[in-house]
């Protein structure tokens, strides 16, 4: 691009759980979406992984905040500070001036006008001069190599931290979709409640996340099961330390209700799909992206329930970010970008 040195172009997957920034076709930031703030001065102390390590361990003068909840901005000031701080981390060489920034940011397909405005304002206040937005399922489709402008129907199920985005895409647009607030964070919360009620142990968000990653499963029978996982915490009745061993079968059981909600949402979108596009989807299968796609056995469970093949995308965690990066390079070409 002419005078590209005057403009810094960034693609941002502003996620509830993680934020990924792409610059010059490379992932330059991939950090948890969390900040640590000094309560007395309101100054930023840490962002990303450093702030995540403080989460649940702070004293009264330090507060950790996750700026996004259920896929949308819940704390405007914290979101702005996080975006600004993450952009500062990008090493683009020494500059004598602050470049004008062009940003493409992805948003949930079910976002209201107020929620879209909040994302735009946060990005602009953090230094974005030219801000575009793209719906997450469209970004996910681009990120896994789908030509979204053909008349062929493709279905994306993107299970992020805050929302599960389900969409049928054809001819450069979203034909039908549903965005539900049952996703990775909900799985983590399910595990915390299960441990509380079933094992009378209190565990934090980070420990529940570790359980989800280590022994999380959508099926109670796996061909290649993970080893059981041991977690430590206080007994809810006595406050004495206890050790509990968790199996993948238990986690499959405790996640069942949330997974049924996702299955029902997929069925709802399929019911809304025009017959010709439905036939394309049955032939091509349904694509799974997002961190939730990594849940063991999820593709098999969904195929068993819905009777359509499901494919876990290559590198599902970064599909949305990569698609946002592709959109950044095609701003003039893609009419589905939101100004």
Predicted feature residues:
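Nucleotide/phosphate-binding catalytic cleft detector across ATP-hydrolyzing
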Residues: 1-159, 167-287, 293-339
